[in-house]
Design a protein with these regions (language model features):
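Membrane-interface helix-loop-helix junctions at transmembrane boundaries of multi-pass membrane enzymes
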Residues: 188-198, 293-300, 344-348, 383-396, ...
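Extracellular and organelle-lumenal recognition/adhesion modules and their flexible linkers in secreted
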Residues: 722-882
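Short periplasmic/luminal acceptor-recognition loop of GT-C membrane glycosyltransferases, typified by
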Residues: 603-645, 675-681
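Transmembrane alpha-helix segments characteristic
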Residues: 16-19, 71-82, 203-207, 302-308, ...
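Hydrophobic, aromatic-rich transmembrane alpha-helices
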Residues: 54-63, 206, 283-284, 288-289, ...
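Signature aromatic-anchored transmembrane alpha helix within multi-pass, membrane-resident enzymes
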Residues: 198-206, 299, 351-355, 371-378, ...
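Membrane-proximal, lumen/periplasm-facing interface regions of secretory-pathway glyco-
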Residues: 217-231, 563-616, 632-635
């Protein structure tokens, strides 16, 4: 073992280099934003805001202004909790989450006391395990309630009342006495003036927590929230129990976590699931601290929790109503139980481990790889410690508990889909059978050249190119945490061998988990979240080595410099969260919604393109409507039945099997479909996914469907059994083919920059040639037209690119009678090197009188325009492609 200065110096430098790299990556996201993600003028502002806040914390701490720092931290906590009560009326979700957590603690405390009788637990260990145990039991009870079709409010309230009476009221006096004792001890602690570290910890926590808190309080708008996590949970509540979605889709993925979500929705509305997931994030952080505290000491435990909570992946994902932090909390608790077992070899720990592992695996299959990896490595460790036979027997009991908790869901999924591990069972069988059916060319070579290299480079990729495994952000989502965890600590004598072995179990188990995930789901970062507690512990171990050495040397300067490096790492993790938020929010975080300057309807209308379309459909007469949806699988925020063609087999089959337009119209109406919803930007962005010739290569949408809604590229058509007779469209655009000029000026058009008239035309003798802003020949044109308010319009033209990578911008600016802007509607589209018809539907707002149509480009390539049209209705009078 190396105890000298060299290892400490190397570790210190490695921490400094990793922190510097994390800062560099995060600053690149701000100063050199990815063209694939929208940037905002607020990005620089947030850079300065976080820099000032972190700097202020450091200044107050070193100036010994402990009470002032504590005052500002407590004031911030009060602000974050109290303001939403008045601005977004969050009281009911608050009370719901608090009640469930309280009951969960009461139930779990009873179980933990019973199972771990005689085992010493600190108060905070007992608290964490009790809350998680109680929530798991509530999920089981909720699953039984749903299985028997008893999701009704009186039954739910009655059941919670019984649990409250049995497990809370009987203990509340003891809890209050404990709290009063803790408050008294805390007061004594403050009177003695030892509050510097408390103030620092609370201030840093608030700074890390505030973005997650604001995101969690905003209305859910992420893909999986809208397609099944919340829409499915809400559906169960509406139907009174667990039944298959009539739409099909991802409904089989709703397991234990969604049972808690359904309970929250029933009692507190759609705001509660995100709060539950955020609570699970905090429990995950708490278990990371508890592991660090048991393995090292309190300081290293705090550092491990800080490192884990600070990474952007945790801070952002934990604020949504996904369930990956549920899995992380339960699998980390599973690891904590194994640590407890390794200390006293009491099988009681493995009973709890079986429960936590069973709930984790029962809620999501992504828990499986980390459980398998951890158990495999722990079994190897027990073999070396000559306790394998005892562990093997106990592992059988633990495995039985895991199986009992998972089996009901697997049976249900098999009955619903034919795959107990939907959808990964079938996928895995296909992947494993591929080498057998393929020619005998070297599969081993293929594995070495691709999968093995990906596996080895995974820690580097997720740091330097995290978008490879997390496509929703430009990068930096795990900071440099994997680099910080480089096992230099393995060679230090400052860390006991038992601690080294257990951290190695966690890290090696994580490696096995990543390897399994690469086979099944490509080890996407969100699915890999359960491995990051162990990476954080490995990183904290390196910091622990440095601190232990500096303590012996009493080096104040180097110790404070290490402290500043940790804060710099925390600062670097705030910026990727800002860059990741690509919703239509200039401020990035939902500040206006949080402060009550924007209501829920406006927030959803601005950030969720289909929201207004959903409201429009729900307002149509006739009760609950059935909608065939192309380019959209979202189901939340509507009472209508949305059949997305991507995940509803019936809808998909109708579109691919129809022989002609008439047959499709009749069959859709026969199946109860009244409307077709098309997300035009999404359909054009992933054409391979929504390639249905009956829709985009025929006149079906014009002959048998009437366009009744168009906004933000979301189109709603009403289906008719017979062909429609539409009014003859009238093109409002003057000089639409650019045949008329007056000197260098186009007649009827306002032009700016370099404008060219070409003799190559789609129809007639002339067309307009424009170049993008990256060219020295950049130019654009517009025309103002008088229109009617609240009227659907078709805006279109023929266009042809002169080179590759050309992008055009279709833009409509709606003006009032005083020519003031009401709103703008726009979309970017790629242009090919042959003539194609480009069109865009939009609805003129109330009080609009004029519209400005723009022809402009991106990049530098030249594009020809011809036959420009703006016409009321869903057609232009020019020749269109089918």
């Amino acid at each position: 073992m190396i105890k000298g200065k060299f290892l400490v110096l190397l570790t210190y430098l490695w921490v400094a280099v990793s922190t510097g790299l994390s800062l560099y990556i995060s600053l690149l996201l701000i100063f050199r934003p990815s063209p694939l993600f929208p940037s905002s003028y607020w990005d620089i502002r947030w850079l300065w805001i976080f820099a000032i806040l972190f700097g202020s914390i450091v200044a107050l701490f070193f100036l010994a202004a402990d009470r002032l720092l504590l005052f500002f931290a407590l004031l911030s906590v009060a602000f974050l909790i109290i303001v939403p009560l008045f601005t977004i009326h969050i009281l009911l979700p608050y009370l719901t989450v608090a009640l469930i957590l309280l009951i969960g603690f009461g139930v779990g405390d009873t179980v933990i006391q019973t199972v771990l009788r005689g085992v010493h637990l600190s108060k905070i260990e007992r608290f964490a395990m009790s809350v998680l145990m109680g929530l798991g039991i509530i999920m089981i009870l909720r699953s039984l309630q749903g299985a028997f079709g008893l999701f009704f409010l009186p039954i739910t309230l009655g059941g919670l009342g019984i649990l409250f009476f049995l497990f809370v009221l009987t203990k509340i006096k003891r809890w209050i006495n404990t709290i009063l004792l803790q408050v008294e001890q805390l007061g004594q602690f403050f009177r003695e003036g030892n509050i510097a570290n408390v103030a620092l910890g609370l201030a840093v926590f608030v700074l890390l927590f505030a973005p997650s808190w604001m995101i969690a309080l905003a209305p859910p708008i992420r893909y999986d929230e809208l397609t099944y996590h919340l829409s499915g949970s809400q559906f169960y509540v509406e139907q009174g129990g667990i039944i298959p979605f009539p739409e099909g889709g991802n409904n089989p993925w709703l397991h234990y976590a969604e049972m808690l979500y359904s309970l929250g929705i029933e009692l507190g509305g759609l705001a509660t699931p995100r709060l539950f997931h955020l609570a699970m994030t905090l429990l995950s952080v708490l278990f990371v601290y508890l592991l660090g505290n048991r393995l090292f000491n309190r300081r290293t435990g705090i550092i491990a929790g800080f490192l884990f909570f600070s990474i952007p992946l945790v801070a952002y994902e934990g604020a949504t109503a996904y369930i990956d932090l549920f899995v992380t909390a339960f699998t980390t608790a599973f690891g904590f139980c194994l640590l407890g077992y390794s200390g006293d070899l009491s099988r009681r720990w493995l009973i709890l481990a079986g429960f936590f592992g069973g709930i984790g695996l029962g809620m999501k299959l992504s828990a499986g790889p980390i459980l398998v990896g951890f158990l495999a490595c722990f079994a190897v460790l027990s073999l070396f410690q000559k306790t394998f036979s005892k562990f093997l027997f106990s592992m059988g009991v633990m495995g039985s508990i895991i199986l009992i908790l998972c089996l009901p869901w697997w049976i249900r999924d098999y009955l619903w889909t034919g795959d107990p591990f939907f959808p990964y069972g079938g996928d895995l069988v296909r992947k494993l059978s591929t080498p057998i059916i393929e020619p005998a060319r070297s599969t081993q070579s293929s594995f070495i050249n691709s999968d093995l290299i990906r596996f080895i480079s995974y820690p580097i990729d997720i740091v330097l190119n995290s978008r490879k495994y997390y496509h929703e952000a430009p990068g930096g989502m795990v900071a440099t945490l994997p680099f910080l965890a480089l096992p230099l600590w393995l060679f230090s004598s400052f860390i006991p061998n038992r601690t080294k072995k257990f951290i190695l179990v966690g890290l090696c188990g994580s490696m096995i988990a990543i390897g399994v995930m690469m086979i099944v789901n490509n080890a996407l970062l969100r699915y890999a979240l359960p491995v990051f507690p162990w990476i954080a512990l490995g990183a904290a171990a390196n910091v622990h080595v440095v601190y232990k050495y500096l303590e012996n040397k009493e080096s104040w300067l180097l110790g404070n410099l290490l402290f500043l490096l940790l804060l710099a790492f925390g600062f670097s993790t705030r910026l990727p969260i800002i860059a990741r938020l690509s919703e239509n929010l200039p401020q990035r975080l939902p500040i206006n919604y949080f402060l009550g300057r924007e209501n829920r309807e406006d927030y959803l209308s601005r950030n969720l393109p289909v929201y207004d379309a959903f409201r429009f459909i729900d307002q149509q007469p006739g009760g609950r409507h059935r909608v065939l949806s192309v380019g959209n699988e979202f189901r939340l925020y509507t009472s209508s039945r949305i059949d997305g063609v991507w995940d509803v087999k019936e809808a998909h089959q109708l579109l691919i099997s129809a022989q002609n337009e008439s047959e499709l119209a009749i069959e859709l109406l026969k199946r109860g479909y009244e409307y077709i919803l098309i997300n035009q930007p999404e359909v054009e962005f992933v054409k391979w996914k929504y390639d249905y010739p009956i829709l985009n290569q025929s006149h079906f949408l014009v002959r048998y469907c009437q366009l009744i809604f168009a906004k933000n590229g979301i189109l709603v058509y009403k289906i008719f059994p017979e062909p429609l007779v539409l009014p003859q469209p009238n093109n409002l655009v003057q000089n639409e083919s650019f045949e008329e000029t007056s000197g260098d000026q186009l007649v009827a058009w306002y032009q700016d920059g370099s404008i060219f008239v070409s003799n190559e035309a789609y129809e007639g003798t002339r067309s307009l040639l424009l170049y993008g802003p990256l060219s020295d020949k950049f130019g654009w044109v517009k025309q103002k037209l008088e229109i009617e308010s609240n009227q659907l319009y078709t805006f279109g033209y023929w266009a042809k690119a002169l080179g590759n990578n050309a992008i055009l911008l279709m833009q409509l600016r709606w003006l009032d009678e005083n020519e003031n802007l009401i709103e703008s509607d726009e979309i970017w589209k790629n242009v090919e090197t042959e003539w194609n018809w480009f069109y865009w539907y939009s609805q003129s707002p109330q009080k609009s009188k004029f519209v400005e149509i723009y022809l402009s480009l991106g990049n530098s390539e030249g594009v020809l325009f011809d036959q420009v049209c703006l016409a009321a209705g869903q057609m232009c009078p020019v020749k269109e492609q089918p």
